A protein has these predicted regions:
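Secreted, disulfide-rich extracellular signaling modules
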Residues: 1-345
Length: 345
């Protein structure tokens, strides 16, 4: 129990989310973003591709009004710094053409911040405006960073967005001119509107989960399996004990987290094992300090000096795509989670 609690701290999970998989599907945008940022094992492909280390997606909560969109962003953590906010709506293709030949094929779409709830006429503030074709369909993305920053600072100011459509030909506002995809009932629409926040967690996460071979966690065998085949283990018998990297697979299903972690199913943290005896070869990636320490130990110049330690000296980040405790989908990057190289230090 203590080991699993420690693991939750490493992954910055305060409350375990409910099991929502497989009946609830994540937004395709978030799945595509994960695949762009990480490989199938969650390891970062290209550092710096994302703004910040957390991407949060919130689905539209308004079912009845075709043009009103509301997002509950209360899952944002204290101290989290928002870098960018995107309002993503899927514009549906108009199926019926106008009978009059002189009607133009474009309309103006305007996005407003609602300043009050339920007031008539609606008090609103214009955020963005653009021309769109009536007969095309696809995602429209609006930068709403300034507005959402205000909502984060004061949650009471969040009354959602309103979209209006104005026909360019005669400047008459027609609310049914263009429709946007809305989730209907229990069945989730893959094209449902999203509010996507790119943030920095501003947390110095506790020491990453790359345990040594003698750690308490691995001794308890708490949902971590060491695969028998070592990764890049030296072949000759004289080198077997030298510092090297071995596999250490963290299985989220075995831990009991597979009901809310979307990707990956688990990951290979790897760990370092072996001795750092003099002479330290180039393959041991030894520091100058470690080299001197191994010499002092070998010459027995000091009884108190031990051999250098075999530890990770190169680490990569891990990406998790998961449902939080309010069933919002989050993509989070965790630094220094995978040992890619071992050395004597």
């Amino acid at each position: 129990a203590a080991a699993l609690q420690r693991l939750r701290e490493v992954f910055d999970i305060e409350e375990l989310p409910p099991d929502v998989l497989p009946h609830k599907k994540p937004p395709q945008f978030m799945v595509d973003l994960f695949n762009k940022v990480a490989d199938a094992n969650g390891i970062t492909r290209a550092p710096g591709l994302l703004e910040g280390d957390v991407v949060r997606s919130f689905e539209d909560r308004v079912r009845v009004d075709q043009y009103h969109f509301y997002f509950d962003i209360s899952a944002m953590e204290k101290g989290e710094q928002m870098l960018k906010a995107e309002f993503r709506v899927f514009k549906l293709k108009r199926t019926h053409a106008f009978r009059r030949s002189d009607v133009k094929h474009f309309c103006r779409v305007e996005v407003y911040e609602l300043l009050e709830s339920g007031s008539k006429p609606q008090k609103k503030h214009l955020i963005a405006s653009r021309l769109l074709s009536l007969y095309t369909e696809g995602w429209e993305v609006f930068n709403v960073t300034q507005t959402v920053s205000k909502w984060v600072a004061n949650s009471n100011s969040n009354h959602g967005f309103l979209i209006t459509t104005t026909h360019v030909f005669n400047s008459r506002t027609e609310h049914n001119l263009v429709k946007f995809a809305k989730s209907q009932g229990v069945l989730q629409d893959s094209r449902n509107a999203l509010l996507v926040l790119f943030t920095n967690s501003n947390k110095r996460r506790s020491s990453s989960f790359v345990p040594s071979s003698t750690s308490k966690f691995t001794q308890e065998h708490a949902s971590v399996s060491r695969r028998p085949r070592a990764a890049s283990v030296p072949s000759s018998k004289s080198q077997v004990t030298a510092c090297h990297r071995r596999e250490l697979y963290v299985d989220f299903r075995a831990i009991g987290w597979s009901g809310w972690i979307i990707y990956p199913n688990g990951y290979n943290a790897f760990y370092c094992r072996g001795s750092c005896l003099f002479p330290l070869g180039e393959s041991l990636n030894a520091t100058n300090h470690a080299t001197v320490q191994s010499i002092v130990h070998t010459l027995k110049l000091s009884q108190a000096v031990s051999t250098p330690c075999c530890v990770p000296d190169e680490l990569k980040s891990l990406n998790l795509l998961y449902f939080d405790d309010k069933e919002n989908v989050v993509l989070k990057t965790y630094k220094d989670m995978v040992a890619t190289r071992c050395g004597c230090h």
